[in-house]
């Protein structure tokens, strides 16, 4: 009985939006925590590398987080794809064109920015976690690996581009999450949009500051 109710809920549009919002919230918390950890690069190699050693000293927790993130990512992508297909099937072409002109740029780019961000995440893991695309990769020396990678202009450019897309994705995603989880009232619409915009800008700017600092010689 409970399984049937859960199945009906998930197959509904409201259910898919809820799953997308909850999984997006978990991924957002990771992005925020990841940024806070990465900003330790400004405190020097010892601080950042010590932080990395601390994380590796907790393998059970680390792998639990990785598994949870992978599950959340799959749910987020699967729900978004299903919602996109459902929207295309339910709306006539004329309505779609009209809706596109009225929607924000961030919302119109959600479905193509997502795959680019996913491609970036895969490259990011190959670069900083596995070291397969970084010829100067040194196991355990996160600081040097970051400097080596971001000293390569195309790598930094791709990272900055991905972070700009992430910022737009976060802005629309946070705003949609407020709506999907019921935190919505016309009186607070502008305030919630501003909160989403400020958070998205701060996260994107914080991430972008790292390759910029490396290329400018501030971090070396």
What are these regions, as identified by a protein language model?
Residues 1-220:
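Membrane-embedded alpha-helical bundles that constitute the cytochrome b-like, heme-associated redox core
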């Amino acid at each position: 009985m409970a399984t049937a109710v859960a199945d009906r809920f998930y197959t509904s549009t409201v259910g898919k939006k809820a799953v997308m919002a909850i999984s997006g919230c978990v991924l957002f918390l990771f992005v925020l925590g990841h940024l806070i950890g990465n900003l330790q690069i400004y405190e020097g190699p010892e601080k950042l590398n010590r932080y990395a050693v601390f994380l590796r000293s907790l393998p059970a927790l680390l792998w639990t987080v990785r598994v949870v993130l992978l599950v959340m990512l799959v749910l987020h992508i699967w729900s978004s794809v299903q919602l996109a297909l459902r929207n295309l099937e339910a709306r006539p072409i004329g309505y779609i064109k009209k809706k596109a002109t009225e929607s924000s740029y961030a919302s119109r780019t959600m479905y193509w920015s997502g795959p680019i961000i996913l491609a970036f995440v895969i490259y990011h893991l190959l670069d900083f976690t596995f070291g397969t695309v970084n010829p100067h990769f040194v196991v355990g020396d996160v600081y040097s690996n970051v400097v080596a990678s971001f000293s390569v202009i195309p790598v930094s450019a791709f990272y900055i581009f991905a972070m700009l897309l992430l910022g737009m994705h976060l802005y629309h995603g946070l705003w949609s999450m407020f709506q999907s989880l019921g935190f919505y009232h016309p009186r607070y619409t502008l305030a919630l949009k501003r909160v989403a915009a400020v958070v998205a800008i701060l996260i994107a700017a914080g991430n972008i500051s790292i390759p910029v600092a490396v290329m400018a010689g501030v971090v070396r």
